[in-house]
């Protein structure tokens, strides 16, 4: 049976242990500015995926990935000493793509703002294609605009009986 609360607690504990060990315990010069962003533990508590970001170039990211891979055994033993579980989960380090995705989204939002500003500038300089007020005004009863109702049909239905195709209803 999967206990999600226990898996979440273990993930939080692993995140804290690994971050502390990376900050103070590993002396590998290849490790750059590493930040542990998230840890996910499987429901059976056998595997932990550790997401991290690295501040720096692609080469520094690759060096940091190699340093983390070489330190995985030591980090796993440190996790095993500090958690209360029968088995120590295996650790997998995954480079987190959130910062790059966030930068791409920020660039897209900036482009959208620029385009919106361009559209607003064009709208201010634009003129109406037709009348300025395209809406039909309601007729006021009592105006003498249409006098042909008085001389129209006897039955008052305003049907043009001389129109082509007109057939009277039977």
UniProtKB/Swiss-Prot annotation:
InterPro entries: KH_dom-like_a/b, RbfA, RbfA_dom_sf. It is found in: Cytoplasm. Pfam families: RBFA. The keyword Metal-binding does not apply. Signal peptide: none annotated. Keywords: Cytoplasm, Ribosome biogenesis. GO terms for cellular component: cytosol. GO terms for molecular function: ribosomal small subunit binding. One of its GO terms (biological process) is maturation of SSU-rRNA. Its main location: cytoplasm. The keyword Cytoplasm applies. PANTHER family: RIBOSOME-BINDING FACTOR A, CHLOROPLASTIC-RELATED (PTHR33515:SF1). Belongs to the RbfA family. This is Ribosome-binding factor A. It comes from Clavibacter sepedonicus.
């Amino acid at each position: 049976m999967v206990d999600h609360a226990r898996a979440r607690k273990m993930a939080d504990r692993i995140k804290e242990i690994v971050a502390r060990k990376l900050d103070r315990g590993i002396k590998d010069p290849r490790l750059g500015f590493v930040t542990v962003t998230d840890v996910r533990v499987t429901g059976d508590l056998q595997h932990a995926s550790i997401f991290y970001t690295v501040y720096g170039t692609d080469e520094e990211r690759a060096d940091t990935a190699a340093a983390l891979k070489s330190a995985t055994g030591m980090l796993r033993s440190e996790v095993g000493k500090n958690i209360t579980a029968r088995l120590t989960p295996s650790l997998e380090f995954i480079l987190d793509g959130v910062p790059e995705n966030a930068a791409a989204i920020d660039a897209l939002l900036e482009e959208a703002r620029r385009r919106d500003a361009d559209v607003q500038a064009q709208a201010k300089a634009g003129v109406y294609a037709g009348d300025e007020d395209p809406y039909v005004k309601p007729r006021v009863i009592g105006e003498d605009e249409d006098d042909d109702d008085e001389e129209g049909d006897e039955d008052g239905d305003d049907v043009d009986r001389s129109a082509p195709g007109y057939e009277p209803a039977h």
